[in-house]
Structure formats: structure tokens, C-alpha cells
Amino acid sequence: MGYNMQQGPGLPPKKSKTGLWIGLGAVAVVVIVALVLVLSGVFSGTNTANGGEGEQAKESKQSAKDIATNYLTAISEGRADDAKKMLGPTSSDTSLMTNEALKDSLTRAPITDISVTEPTGGNSSTVNVTYKVGGEPVNEEYTVNVRGGTISTSTPHLSLYGLKGVDITVNGVTVKEGDKSYDVFPGSYVVASANKYLEIDGESTVVVTKSSSDNIPRFKLKVSQAGIDLFREKVIPEAKACLESKNLDPGCNMALNGTLRDGKTLEDGTITRTQSSENANKLENVVPEPGASVPTIISASNLGSFKVTGICTESTRSGECELLGGFAAVKGMKFPKASLNVAEEDPKVVWEDV
């Protein structure tokens, strides 16, 4: 026999506690999120507004005027590394933007009287700057990236085009390669050859600013007095020895042909070579020039000519004769071009073909 148990109408259903726990958990999550927001957002925002060290505060402290002033001040104090950090990225060669080169510049042309106007613009602001380089006033315009804290305007440049094939120093700093352009700070720059036998032809010290860098004359090389002295020391004794030789081939790459164009023959050992006083003076005072493609190969071709006499034989007759350009090969009637490679430790004279 079975009985069906039924709940009485007066008893309410038993309530579940699951909803209560879910509600309490949601409240806890809200509280935790609120705390995180307060700690990270509100507090940091409050610090920034009150001059704290947040990123926005750092940006607000660096105005365009401040950045430009700090940049020029760093240059004026010889702090090249600090000044470079305030420049925007560049693909140009900056190997001359060193403390050594800058400090050398300041000994001749100090940067003084720095003044920067209030900026115009937004994140990239424009300021006018004035300063003096060695007492000479300079007025320039800088574009400043306020957000990045850098100067966007390109720096002055020093062009060394024309100085290829030889090591060059600028303010005592050796550059890896001449014949190119280098970024520099505004200032005074002394350009010199690292090889003592060569030097800059003309003015070697220039003041460079952004407005003047395009107007600097092209540099070129000439043989220094040390190079002239070395050339004469090496070349003149050899040339004189060749003049004194009685042989058809005296050396100096100026051998005579033993058979003249008119059929006469020259007797070896009877040749006399005589320079006039004018031509002797050319030899004694020769001034070489640097090579066009390889400047360390210095040379001279105007060493003077000379008169050539000797014993000539025609058929059965012999006698002294004088050689003229019309009756003998040109070679042997004058000194050929003499050259010397001053890049070598002990350079030797090379007598080239006429």
C-alpha cells in the first residue's frame, strides 16, 4: 500500500543561498577594481597635476625655448655629447661632433650671448635664436620637437669635397674619409692634412654656422714646404748626376737613341749635357704639385731642358755635333716628369716617360 506525501499549503519553499554569495562576490570585485583605479589613475593624475614626475610632467617642463637654450648652452660649454642627445636622428656623418673638436673650436670662437624667443606652434615649435661665434652675431631659426625634446632643424655642415686620397684632420680629429660632408656644431674649424708633406692651399680655418656652411670655398691641397724640400732633396741630386753622365743612357729615363734620324751615329761615352743658367734655376727651384687622383704622389715636369753634344759619325767621318729636336728623338733632350710618393716611408724618385 503506498502513500503520496504532499507539502502543506502553509509552508514556504526553502530559499537557496547561491544568489547571496554571487552578489557579495560582485561587490568585492567592484571594490578591488575601484582601489586599482584609485592607486594607478587618480593618484598618478593628482601627482602629475601637482608637478609630479609623470611623463606628461616631464614634457611640460621642456618647452621649445628651454630645449633650444639648453642645446646652445651645451655647445658653448664644450659638452658635445649632451648637445648631440638634443638633436633629432640623422643619416649624416657626425664623427666631427666630439668634445675634442668642439673644445678646440671654443678656444678660437667661443659661443656667447645666447638668446631664444618664445615659441610658436604645437608639438613642433619654431623659435628664433641669436648668439655670437667668436664675437660675430648669428641669427637662426630652430624647429623644436617638444614631445621628443629635440632640435629638428639640421645642423651646419663642413664640406671636405676635393680632399680625397689623403687623411685629413679637423680640429685635431682625424676623419676616416675626406671628399665628403660632415655635420658639425656651429664654431671654428681648422682643416689640415695628416700628411706633413701636404697642406691646405689657401685659408684652412673657417667659421661654420648653418647660414654660412654652404658658402665655404672648396678646399684643395698643395705641397707643403716640407714636401718641396723633400722633393728637391731627392730629385735634384739624381738630375745633376744624369746631366754629368757621358753615356747615351744617363739614367733619369732619358736615354738617347744612338742612331739619329739623318743616319749619323752617336758615340757612347762622348755625350755632354749642358743647362743654361735659366734652366739650371728651374731645376734648383722646382715646386712639385700633388697628384689629381692620388695627392700623395707629388710631381714636377718643368725641370728645365739642356743642350746635348757628342761625337757623331757619318760614313767615315767623325766629329762633334749638337743634337736638335728636329734630328733626334725628343726623349733625352729634356728632363721627364719626376714624381715622389710621400705616403711611403722612404720614397724613391720615379722618372716617367716623356
Question: What would you call each of these model-derived segments?
Answer:
Residues K15, L20-W21, V27-V30, A34-N70, ...:
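Short, low-complexity N-terminal intrinsically disordered segments enriched in polar/charged residues
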